[in-house]
């Protein structure tokens, strides 16, 4: 999984201007925090990894990478980001993981029966990210305008909904083996075909996934790959 994710990150992110010597004597810092959400009516645990240069380059702002399924994905993603940024393959990122161990389905998979868009608990989770989590991170940490969201299966599909807005809060999406919901291929293809925002989208699956996931992701890949829009940078990793 880690090797697989390294490939995805290299595809998604640009080459860093720093080299490994700049970061050699610096250490990463991790913070465990809690956000009290009015939308969710509960507390949510987050884990934050600060870039190695965060306490040295005090004027610098860093891309934010939000990791859904953070209870098991955070260490994979944050470790990969630190490794690749250390060697200068990608820029340093501030990584935040959102624990969804007991809330994964209600957070990401409650949809309207007709439109198949988020309702009730999933709509609330969407609002929590947009109106509470991101503002909290912006207020308390030095983050740049470029934000990436990472999800797997259910949360990977959920991450796509952020791209359906006129000015999406996330300009980068890493979609790992998404469980693609009804209408999502159509919604996503239509929106990305006409978007005026610069979007970086990376899609992945493998033959080790469930057959339905592999087939649906392959179909989505074909659809997105056919889009002719200079604002979309689309890459896929299917094997």
Language model feature labels by segment:
Residues 20-63:
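A domain-start/cap signature at the N-terminus of enzymes
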Residues 71-126:
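Active-site machinery of serine-nucleophile hydrolases
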Residues 78, 131, 160-164:
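Short, hydrophobic alpha-helix immediately C-terminal to the catalytic nucleophile
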Residues 181-239:
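The feature captures the conserved acid-bearing segment of alpha/beta-hydrolase catalytic domains
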């Amino acid at each position: 999984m880690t090797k697989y994710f390294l490939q995805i990150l290299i595809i998604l992110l640009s080459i860093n201007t720093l080299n490994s010597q700049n970061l050699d004597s610096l250490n990463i810092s991790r913070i465990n925090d809690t956000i009290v959400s009015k939308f969710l009516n509960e507390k949510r645990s987050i884990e934050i990894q600060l870039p190695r240069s965060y306490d040295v380059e005090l004027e610098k702002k860093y891309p934010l990478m939000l990791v859904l399924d953070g209870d098991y994905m955070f260490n994979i993603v944050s470790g990969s980001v630190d490794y690749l940024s250390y060697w200068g393959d990608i820029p340093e990122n501030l990584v935040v993981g959102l624990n969804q161990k007991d809330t994964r389905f209600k957070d990401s998979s409650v949809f309207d029966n007709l439109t198949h868009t988020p309702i009730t608990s999933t709509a609330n989770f969407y609002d929590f990210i947009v109106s509470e989590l991101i503002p909290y991170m912006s207020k308390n940490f030095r983050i740049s305008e470029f934000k990436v969201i990472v999800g797997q299966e259910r949360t990977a599909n959920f991450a796509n909904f952020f791209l359906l807005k006129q000015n999406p809060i996330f300009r980068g999406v890493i979609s790992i083996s998404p469980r693609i919901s009804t209408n999502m291929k159509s919604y996503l293809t239509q929106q990305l075909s006409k978007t005026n925002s610069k979007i970086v989208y990376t899609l992945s699956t493998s033959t080790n996934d469930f057959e339905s996931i592999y087939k649906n992701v392959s179909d989505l890949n074909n659809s997105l790959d056919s889009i002719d829009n200079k604002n979309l940078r689309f890459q896929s990793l299917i094997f």
